[in-house]
């Protein structure tokens, strides 16, 4: 079904809400049922083991002790380890067995091996094209070391000759994306966490169909959870019938596995290797305020033109090739990227993988906080952080740096809002300023520091983004649009309510209790 609505573009799905009966007997209902049956089986096996092991009391103690020693000596976040220890103390045998199950997941190992291989191949693809690292070392050796770390952790070097445009709202990004898509001559790559039919996606899809008819290669990669939340399991087939290559990343199957914990949270658009977009804006109407869900939706994005676009081209191709035997990077990187020779500064696109052991997203944020001299201004939808990030925020403020966070005034997830408030008191005590955006929901992921550094991307200050998602961002140094980012922060701040210890005390008791309980298991959520 290909419907067109006036001014809203194409639709591939029928409008209408599904009733309870349809939901129960849908593919999602079947998968949920199979999940529950498998969980019931696992719980039964664990319960049987729990009943059997007490007959060998000494064996139970030794078994738990071995698991605890292994946990304490393994790599990982100390807060997460503490959470597991609490779990062990509440349910000793079940907790230990469940921990072993999550650690032995085969899907995780296969994903890690494949991403490592792709990074190795990608490093050779971009090495010959980047010469900015030496210039950065001459400009700022400390930041050059961070760039070297990012290049070593992944395969994305620092670039010069790249113009960056900052969009303070999703509507602004959308207005720039449409003409960029219409100008495509060779290829269009779209990678998004959420795609939902409506005005935004409808207009984009209409352009993609026209471009396919003109011989442009179009690829769309969507996170697999969209099959249940916004699209249908056969949506890739519907797209392919239109000539658009479409994939779901890690589609959810009816098998219990921690493999599904790793989601593709990135938002990338690349056109002909000349233009790239990233930021918090997905392809759904709430991101451009055509649909109001949590008040005004405040989001941000950037558009790159110039050499750094090559990194986003490779970033997309790496993710596309995860379930394939070969990667076609050389064919698309062969298209010459036009450098913007008069564009000052440095741009460093980077990605963060949950399976390689390098927490690049968190390290870049901490690096900015540790280097700042005057201010670090942050916009984030969530604040569910580990000890390292909390300490970095506190230490920067205690050094006299103006550390100021803007969070939502109207949350999209009440549990996340409760968890965020559990961090407020300790941060404010150290001098960190926190404000909440009263008109609605902040979905922006922005760091800006000292009028010369900034990050705009997809990386939230929460465990999901920092530990469990595939993410991406653009780091900028001495780029003119950094002034626009700081100006937007100040403009947004005027619409915020400053949080104080007194206001925090007025939180509802239910919110305080929920936050305290959830904080104990936050790393496992």
For each of these PLM feature ranges, what is it?
Residues 299, 379-380:
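A short, conserved beta-strand element enriched in hydrophobic/aromatic residues
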Residues 386-390, 404-406, 414-418, 436-437, ...:
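Extended hydrophobic-aromatic, low-complexity segments
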Residues 399, 404-449:
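A beta-strand-loop signature enriched in Asp, Gly, Thr, and Trp
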Residues 193, 381-382, 416:
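Glycine- and other small-residue-rich loops at beta-strand/loop junctions that grip anionic moieties
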Residues 2-363, 367, 371, 395, ...:
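N-terminal localization/anchoring segments of enzymes in phospholipid and broader phosphate metabolism
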Residues 372, 382-404, 408, 413:
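Helical hairpin unit composed of two closely spaced alpha helices linked by a short loop
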């Amino acid at each position: 079904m290909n419907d067109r609505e006036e001014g809203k573009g194409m639709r591939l799905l029928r409008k209408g809400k599904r009733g309870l009966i349809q939901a129960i007997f849908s593919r999602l209902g079947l998968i949920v049922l199979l999940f529950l049956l498998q969980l019931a089986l696992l719980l039964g096996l664990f319960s049987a083991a729990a009943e059997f092991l007490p007959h060998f009391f000494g064996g139970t103690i030794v078994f738990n002790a071995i698991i605890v020693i292994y946990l304490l000596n393994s790599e990982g976040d100390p807060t997460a380890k503490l959470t597991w220890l609490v779990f062990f103390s509440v349910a000793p045998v079940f907790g230990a067995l469940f921990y072993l199950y999550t650690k032995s997941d085969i899907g995780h190992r296969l994903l890690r091996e494949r991403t490592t291989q792709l990074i190795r191949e990608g490093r050779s693809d971009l090495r010959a094209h980047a010469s900015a690292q030496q210039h950065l070392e001459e400009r700022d050796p400390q930041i050059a070391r961070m760039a070297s770390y990012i290049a070593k952790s992944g395969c994305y070097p620092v670039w010069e000759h790249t113009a960056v445009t900052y969009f303070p709202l999703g509507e602004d990004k959308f207005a720039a994306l449409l003409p960029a898509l219409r100008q495509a001559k060779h290829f269009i790559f779209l990678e998004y966490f959420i795609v939902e039919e409506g005005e935004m996606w409808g207009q984009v899809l209409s352009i993609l169909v026209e471009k396919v008819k003109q011989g442009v290669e179009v690829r769309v990669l969507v996170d697999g959870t969209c099959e249940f939340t916004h699209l249908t399991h056969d949506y890739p087939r519907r797209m392919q019938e239109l000539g658009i290559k479409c994939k779901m990343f890690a589609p959810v199957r009816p098998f219990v596995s921690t493999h599904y914990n790793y989601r593709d949270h990135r938002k990338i658009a690349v056109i002909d290797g000349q233009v790239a977009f990233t930021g918090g804006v997905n392809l759904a109407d709430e991101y451009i305020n055509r649909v109001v869900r949590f008040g005004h939706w405040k989001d941000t994005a950037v558009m790159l033109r110039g050499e750094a676009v090559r990194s986003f081209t490779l970033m997309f191709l790496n993710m596309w090739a995860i379930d394939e035997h070969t990667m076609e990077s050389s064919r698309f990187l062969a298209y010459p990227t036009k450098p913007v020779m008069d564009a000052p500064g440095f741009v460093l696109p980077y990605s963060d993988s949950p399976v390689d052991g390098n927490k690049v997203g968190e390290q870049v944020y901490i690096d900015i906080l540790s280097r700042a001299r005057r201010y670090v201004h942050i916009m984030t939808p969530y604040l569910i952080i580990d000890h390292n990030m909390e300490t970095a925020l506190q230490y920067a403020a205690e050094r006299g740096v103006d550390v100021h966070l803007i969070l939502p005034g109207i949350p999209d997830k009440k549990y996340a809002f409760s968890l965020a408030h559990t961090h407020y008191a300790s941060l404010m005590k150290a001098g960190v300023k926190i404000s909440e955006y009263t008109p609605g929901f902040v979905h922006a992921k922005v760091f800006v520091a000292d009028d010369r550094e900034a990050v705009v991307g997809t990386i939230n200050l929460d465990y999901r983004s920092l530990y469990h998602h595939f993410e991406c961002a653009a780091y900028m140094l001495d780029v003119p649009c950094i002034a626009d980012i700081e100006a937007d922060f100040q403009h947004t701040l005027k619409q915020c309510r400053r949080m104080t210890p007194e206001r925090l005390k007025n939180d509802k008791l239910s919110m305080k209790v929920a936050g305290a309980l959830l904080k104990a298991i936050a790393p496992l959520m």
